[in-house]
Curated annotation (Swiss-Prot):
Organism for this UniProt entry: Mycoplasmopsis synoviae (strain 53)
Predominant subcellular localization, coarse grouping: cytoplasm
Protein name: Histidine--tRNA ligase
Catalyses which reaction(s): tRNA(His) + L-histidine + ATP = L-histidyl-tRNA(His) + AMP + diphosphate + H(+)
SUPFAM superfamilies noted in UniProt: Class II aaRS and biotin synthetases
A matching Pfam family: tRNA-synt_His
GO molecular function, one term: ATP binding
Taxon lineage: Bacteria, Bacillati, Mycoplasmatota, Mycoplasmoidales, Metamycoplasmataceae
């Protein structure tokens, strides 16, 4: 008998397996830089776990690999990893260690789907879970991790987000949506008609076929049902995302994600300009009831899962990985900087935005951690020391910035009130902690970025000698350096040298 691989599975040859390993290694490296700790979870679970958590989704209805073991227990191969993680989180009381918990995992997932390119019955997910009190800062933090991963993988992407509020708001909305869609029932696909009958009306919005129909696009909007608190949350998310120059994103009310436990913010990342049917490579969102529903503490979490196989397929097709594979293998980071903001600081959002932009700067490979939950500086300070951080960066109640340099045992202060509108390299420079906060050999700015930095440097200090010393940190010659739109004359360099 000639044996074939099981339908929906893959054989990874040497080259593809090597690339898959590189992608997973990069993922683990980046999540650890963001303070997430790696855990491993079992592939086998009790089937009831997923029946109770994703019952209304296609996963819970028809895609699970279920079976009875020899003791007649109903088991399954996990179809997704969030419920898998939450079960472990609750059972092992991981929540007892801290109010703020960040975890990462990589593992095989199994779904009985119709196989096609980008959709397999056995595939690998890499994901994170940031457990703790709901906070839009944490949402932005997780999104920065997603964007940094995409930059490291050299993937051009489309980021879509939506805010689906809480159960109470959605219930009111779904009643209105159900009434509206009933008028068009005959024009819906068979699967969407079943969703109407079972009360899973929300899923009609992201149905591949029906979502493209005009009457679905013109359906009542969930945003019309937002509370003032919901509107403020969305506003803060948009403010945070808008500060990152060059970031393109869309708020799309048809993005609802397919799992029952999501609420508040949801998002997905697809490959830009892709013609593939399965182009979503990352999906995630916040869930505020799942942990409690599985008999854990009443707390929230935000996370995402990356489809490793889809990423690998895309990189193989584009062959861009060949140019960057050595960077995936050799990228490393040594230093950690721990950030904390006083709860009452009026510039807390600005401080986080500064941190947010540093996180997304692909030239900075240092580990930057933000403490969201410590109520005072002393507790945050002890955490920073425990993590062997190189420096502790704080925003005080009066909006002053303080940098504690553990390596040299120094402390420096600066008032950043007037500098918060600078959100690129200039903000680093204006903080006057550039050489202490970041080692100059960690990155080399582009000429355009250097022009911006030199302009700010000259305006602030007016010192040619300091400017020359500053530029030489990045191994630039005199002819490379600009301020405003003019080259610095060599005569100035000569006078600065003397």
């Amino acid at each position: 008998m000639k044996y074939q691989r099981v339908k929906g599975t893959q054989d990874y040859g040497v080259e593809k397996a090597f690339l898959k390993d590189a992608v997973e290694s990069l993922f683990l490296k980046e999540v650890r830089l963001h303070g997430f700790e790696y855990v491993e979870l079992p592939t086998l679970e009790h089937a009831q776990l997923f029946r109770s958590t994703v019952a209304q989704s296609d996963i819970g209805n028809k895609e699970m690999y279920e079976f009875l073991d020899k003791s007649q227990r109903e088991l399954c191969l996990r179809p997704e990893m969030t419920a898998n993680f939450v079960r472990a989180f609750v059972q092992n009381k991981w929540h007892a260690a801290s109010a703020e918990n960040k975890y990462a995992y990589v593992g095989k997932v199994f779904r009985y789907e119709r196989p096609q390119k980008g959709r397999y019955r056995e595939f690998t997910q890499a994901g994170v879970e940031f457990v703790g009190k709901a906070d839009f800062f944490k949402d932005l933090y997780v999104i920065t991790l997603v964007l940094r991963l995409l930059a490291k993988l050299h993937i051009k992407y489309t980021l879509k987000l939506n805010y689906i509020s809480n159960k109470e708001t959605r219930k009111k909305y779904e009643e209105t949506l159900h009434k509206y869609l009933l008028e068009y029932k005959d024009q819906l696909s068979e699967s969407s008609q079943k969703r109407l009958e079972t009360g899973n009306v929300f899923r009609v919005l992201d149905d591949k076929e029906d979502s493209q129909k005009d009457f679905v696009k013109n359906a009542p909007k969930l945003s019309d049902f937002y509370s003032e608190e919901d509107k403020e949350y969305v506003k803060n998310i948009k403010r945070g995302l808008d500060t990152y120059h060059g970031l393109e994103y869309q708020f799309d009310e048809q993005v609802v994600r397919g799992l029952d436990y999501y609420d508040d913010l949801v998002f997905e990342v697809s490959i830009k300009d892709s013609k593939a049917a399965q182009d979503v490579i990352i999906g995630g969102g916040r869930y505020s009831n799942l942990i409690k529903d599985l008999e854990g503490p009443e707390t929230s979490s935000i996370g995402f899962a990356m489809g490793v196989d889809r990423v690998v397929d895309y990189l193989m097709d584009q062959e861009v990985y060949k140019e960057h594979l050595d960077k995936l293998e050799t990228a490393h980071s040594e230093n950690e900087y721990y950030f904390w903001a006083h709860p009452e600081a009026s510039y807390k959002l600005n401080f986080f935005v500064w941190f947010f932009n540093l996180q997304l700067n692909e030239h900075i490979s240092s580990s930057l951690l933000f403490d969201y939950d410590s109520p005072n500086r002393n507790k945050a300070f002890e955490k920073a020391k425990k993590l062997n951080s190189k420096a502790f960066v704080t925003l005080e109640e009066d909006n002053s910035l303080t940098v504690y340099d553990f390596k040299y045992g120094t402390k420096k202060d600066a008032d950043l009130k007037e500098q918060y509108h600078h959100l690129d390299f200039t903000s680093l420079l204006d903080s006057r902690h550039f050489d202490n906060l970041f080692d100059s050999n960690l990155f080399k700015p582009s000429p355009k970025e250097l022009m911006c930095m030199c302009s700010a440097f000259r305006n602030r200090f007016g010192d040619s000698k300091a400017l020359l010393k500053f530029a030489k940190q990045f191994h630039y010659s005199e002819d490379d350096v600009y301020f405003s739109d003019q080259k610095i004359k060599k005569s100035k360099w000569k006078s600065a040298k003397s």
